[in-house]
Amino acid sequence: EFRASIPQNVQIEAIDPHTARMTWDPPAKSYGSIIGYTIQWSTDDLWLEQVKVASDNSYDFKDLQSQQTIVASILAHHRPDTSVKFEYIGTRSTPVKVTTPLPSRVMKKPSFRATYCEDLEELDMLIHDPEEVVGMFGGFEVLMRAGDAELLKSWQSVVNLTAEERRYKLKGLVPSLPYAVTVRGVALPSRRFSELAEPVHFKISRAEQSVPQNVDMQATDPHTIEMTWDCRPNPTVALLATPSAGVAITRSSRSLHLASVQLYTFTGLEPQVSLSASICVHYKPQKSPNFEYISSFSEVVTATTPSVEQVDFAEGEE
């Protein structure tokens, strides 16, 4: 008799490369009124979540990837007409499975690079030119997901760029909140979208967590100043990035880009020259090679090279 509480004729089919639709009929026997259903589903054999739906007969799984396998089952929630405080949960149906198809290609899968700069508080996205477009290229759409469960949420459209635009700057991002961004192209006149570009996943750090520490400058002779610093692990960025993929030093109006070191020597200076500099760190994620995170600049430090006479006098005293 317990099988009578199972939803009937449970089926699932792929509607397009990014959508699957599950349908069912009510159970053969209802213990009062059916007040809803719970769908348990997975993608590629990894259970993700349970979805509660109203007393409808269909549910759409959206924002899937092409060639992604969905496995789902469903159970009904019953409420006896004579006892509003009692709920009867029926038996789960046999799982059904479907795999989304490959898209009929309208252009090559797009790609982009993204850089977040703490000092500017913005994500700078540079989208590469579209390739192999079927028809006329109609522009790119930027999409984003945010939140602790951003992987489970639908992509939200941020902006539609014109066919000529390749750059977009995203502002107002919140520290310590997980984000994912991607793009897709549209072909005209069909208005069909391309596949989504490989997303970039990241979190915004607080400045004090990523800025270089213990920055110091010391003159070693009349023509040389050494600058040192520490790049402590970043509790936010380090989840995604290797510490200090590179550093940048600002000296007056000049910028120097260095490899992953913790010392730089300014040479060829004149005696009694004051030098001021600050430094930031460039983080490169391990899982998102097209993303770069630039920390805030450190406080400015200053050092002055001694005169030749000062050095000669000091050596004479020794």
Swiss-Prot record:
PROSITE patterns assigned to the protein according to its UniProt record, in alphabetical order: FN3
Transmembrane parts of this sequence: none
Q: Which segments constitute the Fibronectin type-III domain?
A: 6-103, 109-207, 211-308
Family matches, as CDD domains: FN3
The protein's UniProt keywords, in alphabetical order, are: Repeat
Pfam families per record: fn3 (PF00041)
- The superkingdom listed in its UniProt entry is Eukaryota
Remaining remarks: ONCA and ONCB are the primary targets of protective antibody responses.
- The name this protein goes by in its record: Oncosphere antigen A
Task: Name its species.
Answer: Hydatigena taeniaeformis (Feline tapeworm)
UniProt lineage:
Eukaryota, Metazoa, Spiralia, Lophotrochozoa, Platyhelminthes
This protein's gene is called ONCA
